[in-house]
Every structure is written in C-alpha cells, then in structure tokens.
C-alpha cells in the first residue's frame, strides 16, 4: 500500500486497471464508473515479496517457538488478500508444517475481524502476521490497549534473518521533546 499511486478526479468517468506483459499480452479491468469527483488508488505486491514475508514470519515463529496467526480480508479483497492467504498456506504446507508440529506450535489463518476479537481477548504469546498497513494500525492499537505506544518496539526481519529494531511510529521524537521540557513521559 505504501508504494501505491493515488489520483483525485473531478469529473464523471471510468477508471481502468491495465497490465501490459513483456510478452505483449494485455489485461484490462474496469475499476469503477463514477458520476462525479472521486479518489483512486492503485497498489501491487510481487509474489516474491509476499513469499519472503511468509518465510520470515514462519521462521520467526519457529525461532521463538510461538504460534503464528495470519489474517487478512480475503472475503472482500478476494484476489489481493487471497493471494497472501494462498502463499502463506502453500509455504506452511510445503516448508514449515513439520517443524511447527515438532515444536508443538500452530499456524492458522483467520479473517482480520475475527483475529481482532481473538487478540483482544487473548493473553498474547503468539505472533500475529499482518500486511503492512494492517500491521501498522493493529500494532498501535494493541500497544496502546495493553501498555503504551512509547514502550513498543518494531522488529523488521528479512528472509535471510537480518533483523532491524526501531522505535514505534513517532514516539521517540514526541517523548524526547517532553523530556526536554521536564514533562513526564510514559
């Protein structure tokens, strides 16, 4: 979603999505016909990127011996989110199921609405894999509900195991300025 292109239009018309393959093949879909001003967004993800994300999640779960939950909204976004679900399921079945079973940990997919309800009622102790935007929003909600956004860390793990730890969104700067003023931080 963060490498998406956006556009605002100010008149009636039709938006289309067109893919032109290197082979010369072309696919065009009508996004929507509108009767007035509208806002549009086009986004993409590559199978390679989704697969790398899935592998990183599964390996992180194995390394930490914790269950892995993956959630999206494939009932609404049948193709886009459905592709994430398909790749996660495929990676699990082909490459990680035996390791998960040996460790006594589980992997499961559920719709993001169901996952939110489960997470709020849970005691934690699992890894919740989400697409980028969903993860940004849900991690902020969880950290605020169960502590403080300022105490949250963000861990980025690449498929080769390279790991980067960073502060949560905007909290360090805000708290630093409070500290300089002698104000209490969390």
Predicted feature residues:
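N-terminal glycine-rich phosphate/adenylate-binding segment common to multiple enzyme folds
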Residues: 1-26, 133-137
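Short acidic, glycine/serine/threonine-rich loops at helix termini
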Residues: 2-5, 79-84, 119-122, 139-143
């Amino acid at each position: 979603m963060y490498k998406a292109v956006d556009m605002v239009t100010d008149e009636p018309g039709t938006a289309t999505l067109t893919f032109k393959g290197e082979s010369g093949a072309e696919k065009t879909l009508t996004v929507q016909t509108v009767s007035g001003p509208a806002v549009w967004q086009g986004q993409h993800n590559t199978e390679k990127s989704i697969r790398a994300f899935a592998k990183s999640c599964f390996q992180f779960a194995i390394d930490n011996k914790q269950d892995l939950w993956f959630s999206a909204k494939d009932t609404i976004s049948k193709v886009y989110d459905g592709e994430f679900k398909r790749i996660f399921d495929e990676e699990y079945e082909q490459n990680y199921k035996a390791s998960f079973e040996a460790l006594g940990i589980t992997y499961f997919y559920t719709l993001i609405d169901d996952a939110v309800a489960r997470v709020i009622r849970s005691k934690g102790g699992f890894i919740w894999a989400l697409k980028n935007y969903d993860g940004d929003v849900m991690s902020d909600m969880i950290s605020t509900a169960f502590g403080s956004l300022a105490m949250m860390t963000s861990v980025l793990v690449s498929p080769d195991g390279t790991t980067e730890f960073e502060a949560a969104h905007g909290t360090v700067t805000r708290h630093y300025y409070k500290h300089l003023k002698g104000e209490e931080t969390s």
